[in-house]
Regions:
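Conserved donor NDP-sugar-binding/catalytic core segment of glycosyltransferases
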Residues: 1-19
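Short, flexible, basic/aromatic active-site loop/helix in glycosyltransferases
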Residues: 3, 20-59
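Short secondary-structure boundary segments
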Residues: 4, 109, 243
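A generic structural motif
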Residues: 19-20, 83
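Short linear elements at protein peripheries
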Residues: 43-66, 168-198
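A short, conserved alpha-helix in the catalytic core of glycosyltransferases
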Residues: 51-55, 60-110, 256
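Active-site-adjacent helix/loop segment of glycosyltransferases
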Residues: 95-171
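A solvent-exposed beta-alpha-beta segment
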Residues: 179-283
Length: 283
């Protein structure tokens, strides 16, 4: 089974549940039709967007970022295929699990997923490995298709890869000519926790040069956290919760109830006086 993965702004990660990239589903994904019509039962099948987020349900592909697998299923269908590297192996394994007579399920238990932090998506190697994985999957499971179907699929995959490379080359050329994107507004911090945490919060902010505000609150007396009436939060803000004052499930529920672009999630552990955010670790 797979779970409900969240981005660090509280929004749901679409790859929490996916459909098998069969010939037409893959074509819709590569051609952009899936993104254009995400809730269409056929065009948007890759992300299974017609499913509710709050209830368990059968899916076709579980994410390799976080999943639980039965030992008996792996004994029957085998482990990850080493022909893949980094991408595609979870789709391949999910397909083999289904072919082995088992089921894949989505469970709405939330986890925080720092997506893409283990890869550099602006590299040529990323583009090569990512799209090569799609071709490996296609050759492995759909090699028997007629050329009338297979050629457009391969062209869509390679076309998407070329577009990604071209876009990357343009960005690098602009940088080499001295054109840079406008720097983002500096990240500010909002620390929320019990009164006993305030001294340590202020020390961490001071020693790490963080622009910060501090709110005394717990799950009991400030249940809505940073979404409470009267708290004004602008973009590019990291809200750090003390995990002794707020459970992880409560933090996820608060962020998930109203995701805000630029408002990120952070956590503070009293046991080791450490703040963890997507952008760094502070002590």
């Amino acid at each position: 089974c797979g779970v409900r993965m969240m981005h660090n702004d509280g929004s749901d990660a679409l790859e929490s549940r996916r459909g098998l990239p069969g010939p037409m589903t893959a074509f819709y994904k590569m051609s952009g039709l899936c993104a254009r019509f995400p809730y269409h039962p056929r065009l948007g099948h890759y992300y299974m967007s017609g499913m509710t987020w709050d209830e368990p349900g059968k899916i076709e592909v579980i994410s390799g970022a976080f999943c639980m697998l039965r030992h008996v299923a792996l004994d029957n269908v085998g482990l990850l295929d080493e022909d893949f590297f980094m991408y595609g192996e979870d789709i391949d394994l999910s397909y083999r699990i289904l072919k082995g007579g088992f089921e894949n399920w989505y469970v709405p238990t939330r986890i925080l997923h720092y997506k893409g932090e283990s890869t550099q998506k602006s590299s040529f190697r990323y583009v090569h490995v990512f799209y090569e994985a799609m071709l490996i999957f296609f050759h492995k499971h759909y090699s028997g298709l007629s050329m009338v179907i297979s050629i457009p699929i391969k062209m869509a995959i390679m076309g998407k890869a070329l577009m990604s490379l071209f876009s990357m080359m343009i960005r690098r050329a602009k940088h080499s000519l001295g054109f840079f994107d406008r720097p983002p507004k500096p990240l500010s911090f909002l620390f929320i926790g019990a009164e006993s945490c305030m001294t340590e919060f202020k020390r961490i902010a001071r020693e790490n040069g963080l622009e910060a505000k501090f709110i005394v609150g717990t799950e009991q007396d400030l249940p809505k956290g940073h979404l409470s009436p009267g708290l004004e939060i602008s973009g590019n803000c990291c809200v750090v919760y003390d995990t002794d004052s707020y459970s992880n499930s409560s933090i996820f529920k608060i962020f998930g109830s109203r995701p805000q672009p630029g408002v990120e999630m952070g956590t503070y552990s009293k046991q080791n006086s450490t703040v963890i955010t997507m952008g760094g670790i502070y002590q």
